[in-house]
């Protein structure tokens, strides 16, 4: 069986959209958000992700900036695929993207928004949330949080019982 990694990443800290005139979808990362992205990218680069790597990203500016920053830290940077349905996605939509991933993909990185992206990480982690390794997830899913799941299942069979939460990365 083939080892696969599923990476669930919430975008880094974004500025408020109040009074900006641009609306929610165009909110950029803050200076702190750019620092968070650099830290997560450096940690992700140490994981030696099995390829090919497939990246799905919401069209929101803050997720695109998160993707660009994180992927620039990887030796073989993947090009993010912008998926409009990731913006405002629910849990079923996120599982749909995972299940539709081509079988030759060894690492899938989903970059999205709360509440759905955090709900997905919590759903997949299940009882692992009780361990000290995942203490950071007990009180929400903070910006730039990335959870790594391992599996040997085909993407279409991904569910809480077929993955193992291996680590959580925070800036």
Locate each region found by the language model:
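Short, surface-exposed amphipathic charged segments that create phosphate/polyanion-binding patches used
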Residues: 95-101
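Short secondary-structure boundary/capping segments
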Residues: 21, 72, 100, 138-139, ...
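Domain-level recognition of soluble alpha/beta enzyme cores
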Residues: 125-163, 170
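Glycine-rich phosphate-binding loop signature in dinucleotide/nucleotide-binding domains
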Residues: 47-50, 101-106
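Active-site-proximal alpha-helix that buttresses catalytic centers in soluble enzyme cores
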Residues: 2-89, 93, 126-131, 141
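Residue-level preference for the first positions of well-ordered beta-strands
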Residues: 6, 106-109, 146
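A glycine-rich beta-strand to alpha-helix segment
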Residues: 105-125
């Amino acid at each position: 069986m083939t080892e696969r990694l599923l990476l669930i990443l919430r975008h880094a800290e974004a500025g408020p959209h109040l009074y900006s005139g641009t609306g929610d979808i165009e909110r950029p990362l803050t200076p702190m958000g750019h620092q968070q992205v650099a830290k997560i990218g450096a940690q992700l680069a140490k994981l030696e992700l099995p390829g090919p790597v497939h990246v799905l990203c919401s069209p929101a500016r803050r997720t695109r900036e998160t993707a660009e920053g994180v992927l620039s830290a990887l030796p073989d940077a993947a090009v993010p695929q912008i998926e409009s349905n990731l913006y405002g996605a629910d849990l079923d939509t996120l599982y749909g993207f995972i299940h539709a991933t081509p079988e030759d993909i060894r690492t899938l990185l989903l970059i999205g928004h709360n509440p759905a992206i955090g709900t997905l990480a919590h759903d997949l982690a299940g009882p692992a949330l009780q361990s000290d390794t995942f203490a950071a997830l007990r009180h929400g899913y903070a910006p730039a949080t990335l959870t790594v799941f391992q599996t040997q299942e085909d993407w279409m069979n991904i569910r809480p019982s077929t993955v193992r939460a291996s680590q959580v990365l925070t800036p």
